[in-house]
Amino acid sequence: MTLLAVRHASLGYSRHPVLRDVSFTLSQGTICCLLGANGCGKTTLMRSILGVIPLLKGEILLDSLPVQTLSHRQRAQAIAWVPQAHDGIFAFSVLDMVLMGLAPTIGAFSVPGKQERLKATEQLEKLGILHLATRRWNTLSGGERQLALIARALVQQPRLLLLDEPASSLDFGHQIQLLDTLAQLKN
């Protein structure tokens, strides 16, 4: 079954297309990698899939529904996004940042329970950063932040996971660990 369908999409900013007539489909369990030069539109495409950047032409369907017709909460429940960089100055703990990934499911102002905390610590452990759980976000390195954001996305258990240059800040060992984790998701 088709999870994501992009049909004849043209996208960009202020009527200036970055990408024109893009079409592809992805089935559940598919791993797809977008390759291209810096500035060619990879991030713009992902942000359009998220519904953040409107299409100039065409359509994007998630489970056969136009993305733009889904509520913010429906999109957040179905799609997890890890940006290239996240510079927050917040003093939240890493565990709290990962738990924020559950907000679309449990509610933005709900207090995560024991079950949610267990899910979050499992993701931190999978990525080899459980030891960072109590560290403050604003004290982390770029690679540590990237891994924490990936853990936050994984704890959501989304139907679609969008990762924008997920390994760019990671050392070789964590790159391998990330790829292993993603391969396990496919199965």
Please place each PLM-identified region on the residue numbering.
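The feature captures the beta-strand-to-loop junction immediately N-terminal to the Walker
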Residues: 35-37
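Helix-to-loop junction immediately C-terminal to a conserved catalytic motif
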Residues: 50
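Conserved ABC transporter NBD signature motif
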Residues: 58-66, 75
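Conserved ABC ATPase "signature" region
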Residues: 114-132
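Conserved ABC ATPase signature
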Residues: 136-140, 144
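Conserved catalytic motifs of ABC-family nucleotide-binding domains
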Residues: 157
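Catalytic Walker B motif of ABC-type/P-loop ATPase nucleotide-binding domains
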Residues: 161-165
